[in-house]
Swiss-Prot record:
Record GO terms (molecular function): efflux transmembrane transporter activity; organic anion transmembrane transporter activity; sodium:phosphate symporter activity; toxin transmembrane transporter activity; urate transmembrane transporter activity; voltage-gated monoatomic anion channel activity; xenobiotic transmembrane transporter activity
Protein name: Sodium-dependent phosphate transport protein 4
Coiled coil location: none
Tissues expressing the protein: Expressed in the liver and kidney. It is detected in proximal tubules in renal cortex as well as some tubules and glomeruli, with highest expression at the apical side of proximal tubules (at protein level).
Effect of residue 226 to S: Found in a patient with hyperuricemia; decreased expression of isoform 2 at the cell membrane; results in highly reduced urate efflux
Glycan-bearing residues: 49, 60, 68, 77
GO biological process, one term: phosphate ion transport
Family: Belongs to the major facilitator superfamily. Sodium/anion cotransporter family.
Organism ancestry: Eukaryota, Metazoa, Chordata, Craniata, Vertebrata
UniProt keyword list: Cell membrane, Endoplasmic reticulum, Glycoprotein, Ion transport, Membrane, Sodium, Sodium transport, Symport, Transmembrane, Transmembrane helix, Transport
Gene name linked to the record: SLC17A3
Length: 420
């Protein structure tokens, strides 16, 4: 008969190592980050995310120019609504693009399973994911300018060419693991492999679907991502409409004002990754760091949005608060969004896709619920929308704070069959 036994009998004795605190007896001396292979891969992923989101954003920007250049003049029948956004602030321009972007994120997490040392995982993931925000900023800032000066086809030529360069770079630079990487130093290879040997095994095992469905830490990540995406969706879709209706200023007509929140978010997101890893070097438990990052990325952002209806100042102050709120929200990149790499590194790519799919329900619900509240109460509708945002965000955050973990789960550990 066959029974399942733990591959590592000392796993329970290394709880601090499971909390991702650096154990100097297991991990060799850290190698420099500058010109290292792992940070080179993070920059390539940053460029890939930049390209993916920028290509989605320019589709919405150039669509207006395409229609205006091919259709006769007619009576205006436009709307101030825009399409939903994704978890990191990227505009979702077409439903068919959502599965593609989910696979891109899941694939990236599969790379970090083999390339991301636990004590550097926050900054590596933040560098990679921040490419989405830089892509939004660049496309919004120059997409309209290129369309007006060179013509809308050149927008596709330029960003399509960037995509081709990105593909070539991916094929040359990206490898499955450090062992097969031809340009990595021996010291860095040993450092990465030793850092991950307690988490990632070599054998392939089936997905423990039932255990995942019963896992409260997994559900805390899913609900936390859902509530945070509710925040981001409302922030990007409805805040510009709010400023337009209250202050009679259309910030979407100003490329710099529209792009400013994304460049601020880009900076704060990467700084947050470095701060998270810095706290780990100060012997903070990993779950503490993840929860601090999630709190800072959720509560201040939602509180700033709730305060908007009570401001007596002009639209500049409101836009500044919106920019700050958008920037702070990306701190969750170092918190809840990479938590699956901590609790189940072997299945992180699948769980990233699953949690992202679950959280994508929020952008579908937000326009319907918010539109209903605004139509029912024109006077206090905006306050109701923002208080609902705060309530949903707070509930998801509390659930994550109560049930979130950072230890590798029992069902995610490597096991082997022994014959008796």
């Amino acid at each position: 008969m066959a029974t399942k036994t733990e591959l590592s009998p000392t796993a329970r004795e290394s709880k601090n190592a499971q909390d991702m605190q650096v154990d100097e007896t297991l991990i060799p001396r850290k190698v420099p980050s500058l010109c290292s292979a792992r940070y080179g891969i993070a920059l390539v992923l940053h460029f890939c995310n930049f390209t993916t989101i920028a290509q989605n954003v320019i589709m919405n920007i150039t669509m207006v120019a395409m229609v205006n250049s091919t259709s006769p003049q007619s009576q205006l029948n436009d709307s101030s609504e825009v399409l939903p956004v994704d978890s990191f602030g990227g505009l979702s321009k077409a439903p068919k693009s959502l599965p593609a972007k989910s696979s891109i994120l899941g694939g990236q997490f599969a790379i970090w399973e083999k390339w991301g040392p636990p004590q550097e995982r926050s900054r590596l993931c933040s560098i990679a994911l921040s490419g989405m925000l830089l892509g939004c900023f660049t496309a919004i800032l120059i997409g309209g300018f290129i369309s007006e000066t060179l013509g809308w086809p050149f927008v596709f030529y330029i960003f399509g060419g960037v995509g081709c360069v990105c593909c070539l770079l991916w094929f040359v630079v990206i490898y499955d693991d450090p062992v097969s990487y031809p340009w990595i130093s021996t010291s860095e290879k040993e450092y990465i492999i030793s850092s991950l040997k307690q988490q990632v095994g070599s054998s392939k095992q089936p997905l423990p679907i039932k255990a995942m469905l019963r896992s409260l830490p997994i559900w805390s990540i899913c609900l936390g991502c859902f509530s945070h995406q509710w925040l981001v969706s409302t922030m990007v879709v409805y805040i510009p409409t709010y400023i337009s209706s209250v202050y009679h200023v259309n910030i979407r007509d100003n490329g710099l004002l529209s792009a400013l929140p994304f460049i601020v978010a880009w900076v704060i997101g990467m700084v947050g990754g470095y701060l998270a890893d810095f706290l780990l070097t100060k012997k903070f438990r990993l779950i503490t760091v993840r929860k601090i990052a999630t709190i800072l990325g959720s509560l201040p952002s939602s509180a700033l949005i709730v305060s908007l209806p009570y401001l007596n100042s002009g639209y500049i102050t409101a836009t500044a608060l919106l920019t700050l709120s958008c920037g702070l929200s990306t701190l969750c990149q170092s918190g809840i969004y990479i938590n699956v790499l901590d609790i189940a590194p072997r299945y992180s790519s699948f769980l990233m896709g699953a949690s992202r799919g679950f959280s994508s329900i929020a952008p579908v619900i937000v326009p319907t619920v918010s539109g209903f509240l605004l139509s029912q109460d024109p006077e206090f509708g905006w306050r109701n929308v923002f208080f609902l945002l705060f309530a949903v965000n707070l509930l998801g955050l509390l659930f994550y704070l109560i049930f979130g973990e950072a230890d590798v789960q029992e069902w995610a550990k490597e096991r082997k069959l022994t014959r008796l």
